Amino acid sequence: MSDLLLNIEQLNAGYNGKIVLKDISLKIYQQDFLGIIGPNGGGKTTLIKVILDLIKPISGTVNFLNKETKNRIGYMPQTNYIDKKFPILVSEVIESGLISKKEMKKSEKKEKGCEMIQQMGLEGIANKPIGELSGGQLQRTLLARAVINAPELLILDEPNSYIDKRFESHFYELLEEINKKTAIVLISHDIGTIIANVKNIACVNETLHYHAGSDIDNHWLEEHFECPFEIIGHGDIPHRILKKH
């Protein structure tokens, strides 16, 4: 088994005294690829905020086994958190992922940024403002920013909200390569995508239910989402999983 990166035990968290997450325990290991699913308002974003130290737990513990890991977390936010009108170029966005590296010279950051631009296939748009990017281009730009600092843990919050479907398979190929060295936590409402790509799954709906492996079925989903699921086919069910077709 890989080494433990993050250990969360008996976590209670929320806002203004209101509990959003209740008695959460979770372990994340090196090279893990954990998919987090759950209904709106179930606490997925709150859990990520606790891991990122943006909010403090009401009780419980969040322990990084290596203190350096806490300073080496890559984060890719939801698309609605991005101000596309902000006057910044693709290359500048990517280099901003090194802002905490005070010891690095500007020239070194520029060189590292160029390497990441090539790795993500962004050479043709490096000098474009982010407001001119397609969804897929913006997604790759923000992924580059998130991994430029070689994080031990990469957190992706609803990455499918960016995706140009033509580049979806390429995006997950990039994640597969990144996962060889980096643990990944991916939050998504797209349960089909989760099942197809992750190694383990956690359903967050106030409490957390962990499922080792990605071979979940509709009964497990119905129990933890508290609504019907359809595994095969198209329909008007609130959440549905479709096999590849």
Task: Please tell me what each predicted stretch does.
Residues 57-73:
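Conserved ABC transporter NBD signature motif
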Residues 52:
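Helix-to-loop junction immediately C-terminal to a conserved catalytic motif
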Residues 154-158:
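Catalytic Walker B motif of ABC-type/P-loop ATPase nucleotide-binding domains
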Residues 108-125:
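Conserved ABC ATPase "signature" region
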Residues 216-245:
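ABC ATPase nucleotide-binding domains
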Residues 129-133, 137:
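Conserved ABC ATPase signature
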Residues 6-8, 21:
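Conserved structural motif at the start of ABC-family nucleotide-binding domains
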